[in-house]
C-alpha cells in the first residue's frame, strides 16, 4: 500500500490481516 496507490477493499482487508 502506498499513499499514492488506490487499493480495492479486499487489499485493505489483507493489509489489516498482515498487521501493516
Curated annotation (Swiss-Prot):
Chief location category: membrane
Stretches with biased composition (Polar residues): 10-20
Keywords tagged on the record: Endoplasmic reticulum, Membrane, Microsome
Segments for region (Disordered): 1-20
Function: May have spermidine-binding activity.
Note: On the 2D-gel its MW is: 60 kDa.
Record protein name field: Putative 60 kDa spermidine-binding protein
Native organism: Zea mays
Amino acid at each position: 500500500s502506498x499513499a499514492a496507490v488506490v487499493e480495492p477493499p479486499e487489499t485493505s482487508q489483507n493489509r489489516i490481516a498482515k498487521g501493516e
